[in-house]
Design a protein with these regions (language model features):
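Flexible cytoplasmic inter-helical loops of multi-pass small-molecule transporters
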Residues: 17-23, 214-236
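Transmembrane alpha-helix termini and helix-breaking/packing motifs in multi-pass membrane transporters
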Residues: 61-68, 119-125, 181-201, 273-275, ...
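Helix-loop boundary and gating motifs at the non-cytosolic
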Residues: 23-83, 239-289
Length: 386
C-alpha cells in the first residue's frame, strides 16, 4: 500500500522535473521525443546495444551448428542465451533502483564488448569450441539482463511525462526494427567477410552506447528512499506489483492472452497442412506479425498521447483474441496473413501500453523492479504458452 500512498507526490515531482523542457500544450508528433537531447542519447545507447545483442545471437547459433552439426547443441546454446533472463532478470531491477542508472548502463555496455571480442579472437586463432560460445553467451546475457531495467527506468527522468507514451513507443519500434535488421546484417557480414568479422562488429557496437550513456545530463540516480541490494528489495517490488491493482490487472490480462494464444509455434502446421504454401509461405507468416507490429507502433506514434491507456489495453487484448479466432477459422492463406498481421498490431500496442502504464504508476525508486518484473513475466509467459 505504501507504493500507492507515495504515487501522487512522485507524479508531481516528475512533472516539475521534466515538463519545463517542453510546453505542457505542445503537440506531440511521432518524432517529438527524439527532439529531446537526453532521450536521443538513451535511444542511441539502446539501438547500438540491441543491434549488438541480436547480431551476436544469430552469429553464435550459426557458429555452433557449423562446429557441431547438432540440433541438440543448438538447443543448449539457445538455453544458455535465455537462462540469464530467468536467473538474473529480477535482480537487474534491484540494481536499477539502487545504483546510478547512467553508470550502470555504461558499465554493462562496456563489459558487453568482452564476449564479442573473445569470440572474434578465438575464431581467428582457430581454437574456438562450442563450450566457449555457451559460457560467453551466459556472460553476455547476464549483462543484458542486469542493465536492461536501468535503460528503461531512466527514460521518464529524461522527458516530460506527456511524452512518455511517445518515447516508449519509439523505443519499442526501434527494438522491433533491430530484431528485423540485425540478423540480416549479421548474415551479410558472415557471408561476405566471415564469422570473425561479425564478432568484431558485435564487439565494438556497444562503444557508442557507453559514450551516449555518459553524455546524459540527468544524474541517473533513482529518486526516493535509498536502498541496499538484497532480497528485501526484491520482495518490496513484488509487494508493489501486488498492491498496484492496475499494473497487476494488466499483467493478468497479458498472462491469459499469451498463455492460451501463443500462436507462433503452430504456424508451420498452418503453412503445411492447411494452406499448403511450403517454406516460402511459412516465412511470410512469420514476417506478417513483425510488419503488423511496425504498423501498430506507427499508429501509436501518429496519435501522440493516449489518455485512457488502460482502456486501450483492454481493447487491443480483445482485438488479439478476435484475431486469434480468425486465424483458427481461416482456410485461406491470405486470411491467415491478415490474422497474424492483426495479432502483431494488437501485441505491439499492448506492449507499449503496459510499459507506459508501469512507468507512470511506479515511483522512480521502484521503476527498475517494476520493469524487470514486466520483462521476466513476458519471457516466462511466452515460454509457458509455447
Amino acid at each position: 500500500m505504501a507504493g500507492r500512498r507515495n504515487l501522487p507526490e512522485h507524479n508531481h515531482r516528475v512533472s516539475e522535473a521534466s515538463d519545463h523542457t517542453q510546453p505542457a500544450d505542445t503537440v506531440i508528433r511521432p518524432w517529438s521525443s527524439l527532439l529531446i537531447r537526453d532521450y536521443r542519447l538513451i535511444f542511441t545507447a539502446i539501438l547500438c546495444g540491441n543491434t549488438s545483442n541480436h547480431m551476436r545471437n544469430v552469429a553464435t547459433l550459426y557458429h555452433v551448428y557449423q562446429l557441431s552439426g547438432s540440433s541438440v547443441q543448438l538447443g543448449f546454446t539457445g538455453f544458455f542465451q535465455a537462462a540469464p533472463f530467468i536467473f538474473f532478470g529480477l535482480f537487474g531491477g534491484v540494481l536499477a533502483d539502487t545504483l546510478n542508472r547512467k553508470k550502470l548502463i555504461a558499465i554493462t555496455h562496456s563489459l558487453s564488448m568482452v564476449p564479442g571480442l573473445l569470440l572474434a579472437l578465438l575464431t581467428v586463432s582457430g581454437s574456438i569450441q562450442v563450450w566457449h560460445i555457451n559460457v560467453l553467451m551466459v556472460f553476455a546475457g547476464a549483462l543484458q539482463v542486469l542493465g536492461g531495467p536501468a535503460r528503461q527506468a531512466i527514460i521518464p527522468s529524461l522527458i516530460p511525462q506527456s511524452h512518455l507514451l511517445n518515447a516508449v513507443t519509439l523505443s519499442t519500434l526501434m527494438m522491433q526494427g533491430t530484431q528485423l535488421t540485425a540478423p540480416v546484417i549479421a548474415g551479410f557480414m558472415i557471408d561476405f567477410y566471415g564469422i570473425a568479422a561479425s564478432y568484431f562488429v558485435d564487439a565494438f557496437l556497444p562503444l557508442p552506447s557507453v559514450l551516449a550513456a555518459l553524455m546524459i545530463r540527468s544524474s541517473g540516480m533513482p529518486q526516493g528512499q535509498r536502498r541496499k541490494i538484497g532480497w528485501h528489495s526484491l520482495i518490496e517490488g513484488v509487494e508493489f506489483i501486488w498492491h498496484t491493482r492496475i499494473i497487476l490487472s494488466l499483467f493478468v490480462l497479458d498472462f491469459f492472452a499469451v498463455l492460451f494464444g501463443f500462436y507462433r509455434p503452430i504456424l508451420p502446421i498452418f503453412a503445411d497442412e492447411i494452406y499448403h504454401v511450403g517454406a516460402r509461405g511459412l516465412g511470410m507468416l512469420y514476417a506478417s506479425p513483425a510488419i503488423g507490429a511496425l504498423i501498430g507502433s506507427g499508429i501509436l506514434l501518429a496519435f501522440g498521447d493516449v489518455k485512457r491507456k488502460g482502456a486501450l489495453s483492454v481493447i487491443v487484448t480483445l482485438l488479439f483474441a478476435l484475431s486469434l479466432g480468425l486465424l483458427g477459422l481461416s482456410q485461406w492463406f491470405w486470411m491467415g496473413l491478415i490474422a497474424v498481421g492483426l495479432l502483431g498490431i494488437s501485441d505491439a500496442i499492448s506492449v507499449a501500453m503496459r510499459r507506459t502504464v508501469v512507468q507512470i504508476l511506479a515511483p522512480d525508486d521502484m521503476r527498475g523492479r517494476a520493469t524487470s518484473f514486466l520483462t521476466v513475466f513476458a519471457q516466462t509467459t511466452n515460454a509457458t504458452g509455447a
